[in-house]
Every structure is written in structure tokens, then in C-alpha cells.
């Protein structure tokens, strides 16, 4: 039986990619998708969003409209939206994958507390194998070079990037700081 996936932010860059990947995987079923109520794709077929023929999945205007159709919610939206989705999901207890960045410490704490009490959660700023390998290499390098060096993280993004520094840059900074026995503010 396929895992029924709901994709939050299906018209965004990551949302579209996730929808395509779910549609291509025989072990997954795209059970539903949604966007912000103000998004022009709400009410239309997801195929229009993806540049594909009609696929029979309507883009809904809220998580409430699709949550009962799925087993897991995949959310790479915006920090305030992801927090609201976690709050809604606390009542429904669906598994959640959150790859959103830009959370404040309080927002992230609330999400983790909601999950601890109500639903399984995978949350990370960057889930790619390459970045997670880079994080490990940064930890090792920081331990080897130790105190004799300054560290600077420089990044570049497309102009549509909504958060800076990125979650990946923060993840790298946290790994280096931990290896050096510092905080990421040092």
C-alpha cells in the first residue's frame, strides 16, 4: 500500500519538485496538495502548476481541506505557514516532514513540542546527502584546525530566496561552533 502524501506549497519551487517526485514513485501516492488561499492556482488542476496534462488533483486553499486524505504532510513553505500547518496537524496526528527555513527559536520550539506530543516529525534545514556530508566535513575540519583559524561562511542564492542566512548556512555554522565548543553566535 502506497504512503499517501500531502504537499504544502505545491506551486512553489520545492513544492513542484516534491509533487513530481511523489507522482513518479510507485511507493507513494499524491493524495492532495494545497497553497495559500490567495494563490491563483487554488481550485485548478495540479497538472497546470506542473506543466503537465490534467492529473485529477485539485490544488486546495488550505491544509484543512486535504488533511484527512493523507498519511504524511511534506512542507517546504514559509516559517509562519509551516508553524500554522503543525498547529493544525496536532489535532490530526499525521506524520510531518518540514524542510522550511527561517524559523525563530520560539517557532521551532513550538513545532518540536507539538510534534513531541502529537505526531511524528522529520525537520531539517537541508536534507540532501551532499549538504549533510559537508556538515560532517566541517565538524571534522573545525576540530582539526581548532582555535587557530577564523571561520566565514559565504553563500549565494537566486533572487527569490526568502531567508538569509539560509538554513543550510546556519546548519554549517552550528556544526562548526559545536565542534569548537562555541555557540553559533561566536
Regions found by a protein language model. Give the residues of each.
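Short acidic low-complexity segments
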Residues: 55-69
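Structural detector of well-ordered beta-strand residues that form the stable sheet scaffold
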Residues: 6, 31, 60, 95-97, ...
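A glycine-biased structural micro-motif
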Residues: 15, 39-43, 56
Amino acid at each position: 500500500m502506497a504512503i499517501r502524501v500531502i504537499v504544502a506549497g505545491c506551486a512553489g519551487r520545492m513544492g513542484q519538485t516534491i509533487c513530481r517526485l511523489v507522482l513518479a514513485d510507485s511507493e507513494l501516492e499524491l493524495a492532495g496538495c494545497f497553497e495559500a488561499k490567495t494563490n491563483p492556482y487554488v481550485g485548478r488542476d495540479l497538472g497546470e502548476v506542473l506543466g503537465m496534462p490534467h492529473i485529477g488533483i485539485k490544488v486546495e486553499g488550505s491544509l484543512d481541506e486535504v488533511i484527512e486524505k493523507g498519511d504524511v504532510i511534506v512542507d517546504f513553505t514559509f516559517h509562519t505557514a509551516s508553524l500554522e500547518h503543525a498547529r493544525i496537524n496536532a489535532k490530526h496526528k499525521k506524520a510531518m516532514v518540514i524542510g522550511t527555513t527561517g524559523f525563530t527559536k520560539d517557532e521551532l520550539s513550538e513545532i518540536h513540542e507539538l510534534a513531541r506530543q502529537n505526531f511524528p516529525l522529520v525537520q531539517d534545514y537541508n536534507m540532501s546527502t551532499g549538504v549533510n556530508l559537508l556538515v560532517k566535513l566541517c565538524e571534522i575540519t573545525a576540530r582539526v584546525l581548532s582555535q587557530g583559524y577564523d571561520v566565514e561562511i559565504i553563500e549565494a542564492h537566486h533572487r527569490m530566496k526568502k531567508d538569509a542566512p539560509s538554513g543550510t548556512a546556519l546548519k554549517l555554522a552550528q556544526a562548526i561552533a559545536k565542534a569548537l565548543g562555541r555557540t553559533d553566535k561566536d
